[in-house]
């Protein structure tokens, strides 16, 4: 097998990576592991057995190609907080009531990880930890090594949260959850409701304790790496870097480290569709004619809304791929598709993927001309990197923030019209936010031939080209990885 190494940087560096147990956090962290290993860094990834199994194939190929990547397992402490066995990932949790126990259980990994670190050889030079794992700060301090935080968000989001944490009185003065307020001292004029914010800036109870630990761990870390590129959001990269005293390295889009078809197809998990079958279907369609529809690995839309989405796609008369997470929750949807004749009616121009989809593989195909997305940061960046304009359908978390960046700032997408956060446990009460006519209208606005649609396609194609240049030798993200390694190398030499 051909080697993945681009060139040796310094073989004595050893980075230990701690991905958070959520698909959207793990996927880019595995890409980061490969990017650093390609520079000659020894990598150790610490995670639980169930989570390690999700990226086993991709990492095995990387290791076979000559990259120095090791995986160490720690047992997940289910029993201490009453979690069912096997619930090692956010997407496996059945209710929001399990979220706080899950985060508390995660922090109990501190002691077993401390023991692993004591036995680790060569001695680690640096930790890269997901923001959601604040216990790693204690470990870094104990071993006197730098800890770098990885968020899984872009700089637009990170700067927004930084500004609001320092202006909490703004949130206190907002009279209701529906009232919009202006983010102060921001490069662009952007408004949000409190519920649309990436994380609760003014959380209470157990969540406040958890959030406070995360924020403290972030601000006491050595620096931050971000899956973005400078050319995508220049004023936000600049201002966030200043806010963090310069120790911010934008190294994305990290998904571009997946060059082989197999790596693209199995990124995150094994796909629910055969790679060749998927590509043959796409090959049969005209360039730019297919809308790719995927609302993420934790989509909580109610059945009534999913039906309207399906009917809107049908009435758009456009070819589409619709990814529907294969779980018990969607059994009723699959039954409706069969019983109503939906699946039969759309079979010539619609491809349904029930489960995990090879997203990067699909988005990079020339037949795809639009992406209806929940605006998770990975999906947002992967769409832009592929030069694909977006229909934004945010659900919760950082997704409304990403929508503002895409639609208002970058002008690389159109909104489906969702303003309300899809609260866990209240989905059916919220009901339908976008009916089939709204879906059809958004698809036409994005995929049609209006001057606005053509300009949008031009802009996002340009951004996609800039993304690829950023990761090439001499590009901004490639150079930032070099600067990061030089920084850690100097620290290591100073300590020795």
From Swiss-Prot:
Its EC number is 2.4.1.-. It comes from the Eukaryota. GO terms for molecular function: glucosyltransferase activity; UDP-glycosyltransferase activity. InterPro entries: UDP_glucos_trans (IPR002213), UDP_glycos_trans_CS (IPR035595). Keywords: Glycosyltransferase, Transferase. SUPFAM superfamilies: UDP-Glycosyltransferase/glycogen phosphorylase. Pfam families: UDPGT. UDP-alpha-D-glucose binds at residues 297, 357-359, 374-382, 396-399. Belongs to the UDP-glycosyltransferase family. This is UDP-glycosyltransferase 73C3. The lineage of its organism: Eukaryota, Viridiplantae, Streptophyta, Embryophyta, Tracheophyta. The gene is UGT73C3.
